[in-house]
Amino acid sequence: MSTTTEVIAHHWAFAVFFVVAIGLCCLMLMGAFFLGGRARARAKHTPFESGIDSVGTARMRLSAKFYLVAMFFVIFDVEALYLYAWSVSIRESGWVGFIEAAIFILVLLAGLVYLVRIGALDWTPVRSRRQSKPGTIKNATNSHPQ
């Protein structure tokens, strides 16, 4: 086969794949539109609480610390994947791979030290750290107003 027919065959297969994928997405969207319910009432936007009258809203404000911890977890988890792949191929990579992995680990440790120094991993606010003394323990059950 010549190169032009190979290129056309390759692009033809991709075009067929692309058209089928778009068609399948459109088919599922149309099916959901035609078969789905049409509830337009005000109660649609309230949370379902098993027959109990709802109290308050379903939206809760979360601290940004939760999102920071999630991002740190993803970052360090991906880095652990890289280190696992390196450990599997340590014989093939030799000393060059070992030095590269050592530099990678040092960069990770520098990032972790930086996060600790700026207080990104500290869950207590600065004002509560100043107020609490090292020898006292605050009772958490009596701290809420009644």
From Swiss-Prot:
One of its GO terms (molecular function) is NADH:ubiquinone reductase (non-electrogenic) activity. It is found in: Cell inner membrane. It holds the Pfam family Oxidored_q4. It is a multi-pass membrane protein. Keywords: Cell inner membrane, Cell membrane, Membrane, NAD, Quinone, Translocase, Transmembrane, Transmembrane helix, Transport, Ubiquinone. The keyword Endoplasmic reticulum does not apply. GO terms for cellular component: NADH dehydrogenase complex; plasma membrane. InterPro entries: NAD(P)H_OxRDtase_bac/plastid, NADH_UbQ/plastoQ_OxRdtase_su3, NDAH_ubi_oxred_su3_sf. It catalyses: a quinone + NADH + 5 H(+)(in) = a quinol + NAD(+) + 4 H(+)(out). HAMAP family: NDH1_NuoA. NDH-1 is composed of 13 different subunits. Subunits NuoA, H, J, K, L, M, N constitute the membrane sector of the complex. This is NADH-quinone oxidoreductase subunit A. The lineage of its organism: Bacteria, Pseudomonadati, Pseudomonadota, Gammaproteobacteria, Enterobacterales.
